[in-house]
Each structure stands twice: as C-alpha cells, then as structure tokens.
C-alpha cells in the first residue's frame, strides 16, 4: 500500500518522523523549541479514529479543524509538516499500516510519538514495528501529575478518595495556599455551590462566546467517505480550534462566568437561550486537545480572582477543583485500572440505550433537554451528564458498554481517559466503588431542586407510583431495593433504607410495580 500519488510526490528524505495525534496539539511541547529541517511532523485524519464509535459530527469537525490549524501554525513557525486528510489515508486500515508506509517513503531512520492518552492507541503504537527506523515514545508534557507516579498513587482496583488527592495537588503546586494552609480557611466550598437559578439569575445569564469556523469542506469530506456521525451538523463550528481562540474563551470565562460559576455549577434551566452553557467555561475541548494547559487556565482564574475582590473564593475553588483535582484524578484512575476497567460491570446492567438517545424525543422533560442539548451542541455541562443522563442510565440498568460508546461519541471533549471513569465509574457505579464511595443515584426530587424542568413535564414530580409518576422516583427506589445487600452497609445510604422500611408495604409494592412498568416501556417514556 502506498500513499495517494499527490501525497507521495511531496515527500522528501527526512531523518526523523514525529507523529502528532488529534488530542496532542500542545504548541508548548519541547519538540517545537528547535526548528530542524530533517524532522517531519505528521498529523493525519484517520478512518480508524472516526469509526471505532459513532462520533458527533461537530466533534469530528472540531478535531479536524484544530489539527489542520495546528499543522498550519507549525509550518508557519518553520517546521516541516505533512497533514493528511481522509482522502490521503483512505487506503489504510489502521494507524500502524499508515505509519509503516509513511516512514518508509520518507527514508527516516527514527520515529517518535507522544504517549497517547487512550489505552487503545498506546497498545496499538506499542506494537509498531518499522523495518529501518528506531521507535521512541515521549511524554505529552501536558498533565500535572506525572505518569510514572500513577501506579503508586492509584492502586489497581481500589478506591482512592479524590478529596485527599486534590489536597495533595494543591500543596504540591502551591495553588490557593497561604503558609501551607488553604486560602479561605477550608479546602472545599462545595456546600456553597448548590444553588438553583432564580428568575432574576436567569435573566442575567451571559451570552456564550461562540466561534464560527467554516467546516463545509470537512462535512463534505465526511460524507464522501461514508463516515457515520450523530448529532446536529452546522457549517459554522462554535468551538475554539486554536490556542488564540482558546485563550480568548478563557478570558471570557474569567470576566463573565467565574463570578457566579461555583454558586450555580449544579444548576439547570430551560428558560434561557444560554441554558446549555450557563456559567460553565466550555474549555474542556481546548484542554483535552491540549491547545491550552491546566496550569495556565488555573493561573488565569486565580489572577482574575486577585484582581477582582468581589469574586468569592468559593467560585474559584470550585473551578480549580475540577481542573487540578477531578481531571487529574480520573486520568490516574483510568491508567491504573486499564484495560480491565473497560470490562467492569459490577451491577450487571444489561439493557440497551433507548432510541431517544439519538433524537432526544422523550416525555421526560429533564432527559429531553439534556439529550437534545447534547445532540445540538456536542456538549452538556457536568450535572446534566451525571445527574440527568447518567442517573437515568444507572436507574434503568443500561449496559456500561452502551453508555460508554454514547458518551464517548456525543461530546466534543470526550476522550476515553476522561470519559470512562466519569461514565462507568462516577455515573454508573459499574466499577463497584473505585471512583465513588456510593452510586450517584437520585430521584426526581433532586432534579426538581436544581432545575425548572419538572413544572412543565408530562410526569408528576411528587408522585411515586402510577402511570404519570415521575419515572425517576419509582426507578430510584427499585434500584435501592434491588441492590440493598451491596449498598446498605454504606453509612451514607443507611438512612435511606430506614426511610424505605418505614414506607407502607402497599405503597412500596406500588412503587416497585410502577418501576417495572416504566422499564417495560422504556422506549416510550
């Protein structure tokens, strides 16, 4: 197999070929400190990366656009770069086949790649054998917690409390610390950050900063190659596709969203055009593609906090915890437990995803909004992902493999290292407690507490049994009843079982029967 003739003719002889994957767009990597005309950088649109799950069309457009921009910027800086589109790579079944051909045609005697953040790709590249070139792997130089410390910090198969890890990271990098103690006198302000949006709050929601990169050529290319996608296609991409735009979005977050971020980070609404973005940074794609780094995001937020005394520490700490704590933590969980983590199904959930996960048409108003938003924007904020969609999948016993594939495909920021621990671990409790100490199961009352979805829903939020009862209510109690033997020893849950036991037997049976009816007609909820 050879590269397309047009691509082949442009190749010269190089000493070294360096591969850049689509989520390795880190312009600050030491690779780029020196310009060497004998080093050729390869960035490629790969069929294998667009077919292992069905991706949201905006996700593919975002990655392809960012990859092309990065290639252009490297070239402008004097580096030798080859960008291969799907047209160029269509003859290759997988990445290794492409690399064997490409490296051979350049005459390179050295091939280098940055360690992939997905186990699947690391395993694949570890098997790469090149006839005339030495293969070398280097670090991505992106994450704060060193890769070679993961096994020591995260024992395989065991729970490691995120809060303890987060505090050590705060100390290690001296973030929000004063004389060895946390700024504000406490480590965690989560209790301050659970407010519902009131009508006056909704009116003042900021209009999200969106970009408008033309992706018509990418959409046409995807169609020409028969790439199956999901979600709403838009010729104008709203996501940042380069470092400058990512920093612009960071600055926008600091100015317009940070002052209220923590307070409303768990809130949801259906009453504003910005209901999909609220006060969230939407920097996750930029971070996960490595267009910007965790530390510069954290430093920008803290600098803005110091320059604006009206911003409360609770708003800042809540954001820092997501980046410095949770993001680094789930990466550790992922690498410490793969590849077995991908097969864990502690609760033996086996149902398939309902069809409305691909069109959003369900009478459950909370789920309708969370799904529709995901399909429209390739994005949902974390509470929608965890407590609406994830909670629904947990209570209805959707197979973890099904949920993993959907989450990995639908969200623009989804890469397996961050998606799987959040989904299989946090949302589904399929890992049996490696990530969370208890399932994040909730009845409809939680949704009602944090949103305005329930008032206009087809189902009745205050009812637990009957055809019109909120499905989450009966499904919640069915879940707790079914898994009692496994969960009742947890002191955080024991009180719930005392409440259940005090419920009249007739009422309990009606609730459980309603749950079974909902499960029987899952496609029609």
What are these regions (language model features)?
Residues 2-86:
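N-terminal beta-strand-loop-alpha-helix module at the start
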Residues 19-23, 44-45, 84-86, 113-116, ...:
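Short His-Asn-centered micro-motif
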Residues 92-239:
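Beta-rich, aromatic/charged-enriched effector core domains that present basic-aromatic interfaces
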């Amino acid at each position: 197999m050879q590269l397309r003739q047009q691509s082949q003719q442009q190749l010269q002889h190089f000493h070294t070929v360096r591969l850049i994957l689509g989520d390795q767009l880190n312009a600050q990597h030491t690779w780029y400190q020196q310009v060497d005309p004998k080093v050729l950088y390869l960035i490629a649109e790969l069929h294998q990366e667009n077919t292992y799950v069905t991706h949201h069309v905006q996700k593919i457009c975002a990655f392809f656009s960012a990859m092309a921009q990065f290639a252009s910027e490297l070239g402008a800086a004097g580096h030798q770069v080859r960008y291969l589109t799907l047209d160029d790579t269509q003859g290759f079944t997988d990445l290794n086949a492409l690399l064997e051909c490409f490296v051979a045609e350049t005459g390179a005697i050295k091939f280098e790649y940055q360690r992939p953040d997905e186990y699947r790709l690391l395993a694949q590249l570890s098997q790469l054998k090149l006839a005339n070139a030495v293969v070398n792997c280097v670090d991505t130089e992106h994450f704060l917690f060193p890769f070679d410390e993961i096994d020591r910090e995260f024992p395989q198969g065991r729970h490691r409390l995120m809060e303890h890890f987060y505090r050590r990271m705060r100390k290690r990098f001296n973030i929000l610390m004063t004389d060895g103690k946390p700024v504000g006198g406490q480590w965690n302000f989560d209790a301050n950050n659970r407010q519902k949006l009131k009508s006056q709050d909704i009116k003042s929601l900021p209009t999200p900063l969106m970009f408008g990169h033309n992706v018509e050529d990418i959409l046409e290319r995807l169609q020409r190659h028969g790439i199956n996608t999901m979600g709403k296609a838009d010729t104008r991409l709203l996501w940042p596709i380069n470092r400058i735009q990512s920093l612009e979005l960071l600055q926008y977050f600091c100015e317009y969203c940070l002052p209220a971020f923590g307070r409303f980070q768990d809130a949801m609404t259906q009453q504003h055009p910005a209901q999909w973005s609220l006060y969230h940074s939407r920097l996750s794609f930029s971070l996960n593609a490595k267009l910007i780094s965790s530390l510069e995001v954290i430093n920008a937020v803290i600098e803005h906090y110091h320059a604006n005394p009206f911003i409360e520490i609770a708003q800042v700490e809540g954001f820092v915890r997501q980046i410095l704590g949770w993001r680094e933590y789930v990466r550790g969980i992922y690498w410490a437990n793969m590849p077995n983590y991908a097969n864990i199904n502690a609760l033996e959930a086996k149902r398939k995803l309902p069809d409305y996960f691909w069109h959003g048409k369900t009478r459950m108003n909370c789920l309708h909004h969370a799904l529709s938003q995901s399909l429209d924007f390739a994005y949902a904020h974390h509470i929608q992902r965890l407590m609406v969609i994830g909670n629904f999948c947990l209570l209805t016993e959707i197979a973890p493999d099904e949920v993993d594939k959907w989450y990995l495909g639908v969200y623009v920021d989804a890469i397996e290292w961050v998606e799987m621990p959040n989904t299989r671990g946090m949302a589904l409790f399929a890992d049996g407690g490696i990530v969370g100490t208890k399932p994040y199961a909730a009845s409809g009352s939680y949704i009602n507490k944090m949103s305005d979805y329930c008032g206009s829903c087809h189902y009745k939020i205050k009812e637990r049994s009957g055809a019109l009862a909120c499905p989450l209510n009966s499904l919640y109690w069915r879940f707790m009843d079914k898994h009692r033997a496994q969960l009742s020893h947890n002191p955080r849950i024991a009180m719930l079982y005392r409440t259940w036991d005090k419920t009249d037997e007739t009422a309990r049976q009606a609730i459980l029967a309603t749950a079974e009816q909902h499960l029987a007609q899952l496609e029609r909820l």
